[in-house]
């Protein structure tokens, strides 16, 4: 699916989109809402019932063209199906981490995968924050041409959709 809320079976009142529309290269964002919310603010001007919302990214023609091109790629190249295949490959390539003595959990949702490191797997006792294990993995990754994202002692794989299976294997080897 395109959105995590779909996987969770949640229908939000508002859905905000930004970087994914243009890859973050051009300023564009979208605020989507339900018909119920829209209708609560829609009326004749004379009623002065309105939800006035605007921003500095409104109507940028280059950004809109980039977003339309992105939507075309998603439609024409079957990106979601390809991502399912890549996500399955990423799960397979990182499965060995589950057996590591200092990995509490490998968890994944689509193309985002997290490896949680702990001092003791059995008790899930964390490392002392001063040890900065996530930072050590990040630095090791950079030294080996891999960009991994640590959040504390959890290392995230958040690859671009253009990644190849060979590149996923490289990330798994380096991590």
Regions found by a protein language model. Give the residues of each.
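Conserved N-terminal phosphate-binding loop of PLP-dependent enzymes in the Aspartate aminotransferase
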Residues: 1-175
